[in-house]
């Protein structure tokens, strides 16, 4: 499994990539493998401010539907529109084209509570 060192990770299997005051959020390689083939994402929180650890949408796989938890507090600026027609990007490129939302980073200290790649690897037993 792949866990890029430049990202931060939540215990709920989301990742965060920070670019200035903006953060991209997606699910980890571990999460997409556990879920299986992703068939649909439902994110209706664009324009809303979501608290850290609150649900910002759902992800549907062939086997199950799971909640998506916000790893940092912030306003959801954008949903990755490519996922509407190609949700499988979450499986094939979870850290690149498969990002799910872009948010404003309300509190940079939220990042301090997240895991680095080594700690996340330990969490998932990889």
Swiss-Prot record:
CDD domains: GCS_H (cd06848). SUPFAM superfamilies: Single hybrid motif. Gene3D superfamilies: 2.40.50.100. HAMAP family: GcvH. The glycine cleavage system catalyzes the degradation of glycine. The H protein shuttles the methylamine group of glycine from the P protein to the T protein. Belongs to the GcvH family. This is Glycine cleavage system H protein. The gene is gcvH.
């Amino acid at each position: 499994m792949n866990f890029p060192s430049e990202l931060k990770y939540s215990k709920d299997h989301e990742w965060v990539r920070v670019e200035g005051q903006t953060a991209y959020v997606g699910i980890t390689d571990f999460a997409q493998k556990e879920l299986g083939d992703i068939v649909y994402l439902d994110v209706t929180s664009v324009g809303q401010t979501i608290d850290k650890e609150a649900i910002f949408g759902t992800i549907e796989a062939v086997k199950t539907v799971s909640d998506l938890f916000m790893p940092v507090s912030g306003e959801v600026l954008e949903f990755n529109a490519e996922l509407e027609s190609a949700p499988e990007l979450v499986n094939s490129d979870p850290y690149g084209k498969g990002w799910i939302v872009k948010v404003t980073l309300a509190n940079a200290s939220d990042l301090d509570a997240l895991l680095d790649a080594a700690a996340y690897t330990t969490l998932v037993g990889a």
